[in-house]
From Swiss-Prot:
Residue ranges with Basic and acidic residues bias: 123-133
Propeptide segment residues: 4-119
GO biological process, one term: cell surface receptor protein tyrosine kinase signaling pathway
Free-text function comment from the UniProt entry: Seems to promote the survival of visceral and proprioceptive sensory neurons.
GO MF term list: growth factor activity; nerve growth factor receptor binding
Entry-linked InterPro entries: Cystine-knot_cytokine (IPR029034), Nerve_growth_factor-like (IPR020408), Nerve_growth_factor-rel (IPR002072), NTF3_N (IPR045815)
Family statement: Belongs to the NGF-beta family.
Localization per record: Secreted
Assigned keywords, A-Z: Cleavage on pair of basic residues, Glycoprotein, Growth factor, Secreted, Signal
Name used for this protein in its record: Neurotrophin-3
Length: 163
């Protein structure tokens, strides 16, 4: 996943909820529980959701084997969702050209407008890779903790378009 620093606006909770609904409707949400076919006593086939424990066991097995899930994302879906700007990341069809520069260390917060204007001029704009909270590059993570404290899977690759 490529990410881009954005200065286009603040991401609201409503816009994020709308984006998540779109992802769910597109069938690409991470927590989609796999289904399996089972036969009842009378021989009829039924579709049964796997239990959460079975799904977790499969995910754990896949992680041990070095498998990282690959999700196909329609490029048009991402183009439609560009209005959901985030100050942190933007899904991009382009790969980053190089690792990002480290953020400039800025002077402590001062409550005066002049220094605020000075600080705003130091922002970096460009394509950024994912890094952890210790500010060192991480390229082999298969799971992470999101901003709400939930454990999530880090995708190794996202295929875009019809290929």
């Amino acid at each position: 996943i490529q990410s881009t620093s954005m200065d286009q606006g603040i991401l609201t909770e409503d816009s994020m909820n709308s984006f998540i609904r779109t992802l769910i409707q597109g069938g690409i949400w991470k927590n989609k529980v796999p289904k399996q076919t089972a036969r009842t006593k009378d021989g009829m086939q039924t579709t049964v959701k796997k239990t959460e424990a079975e799904a977790d066991a499969m995910a754990s097995k896949d992680t041990r084997l070095g498998f990282q899930p690959v999700v196909s994302v329609d490029a048009e879906l991402l183009r439609q969702q560009r209005r959901f700007s985030s100050p942190r990341v933007l899904l991009s069809e382009n790969t980053p050209l190089e690792p990002p520069p480290l953020y400039l260390t800025e002077e402590p917060m001062v409550l005066n407008r002049t220094s605020r204007r000075k600080r705003e001029g130091k922002s970096h704009r460009g394509e950024y890779s994912v890094c952890d909270s210790e500010s060192r590059w991480v390229t082999d993570k298969s799971s992470a903790v999101d901003i709400r404290g939930h454990q999530v899977t880090v995708l190794g690759e996202i295929r875009m378009g019809s290929s």
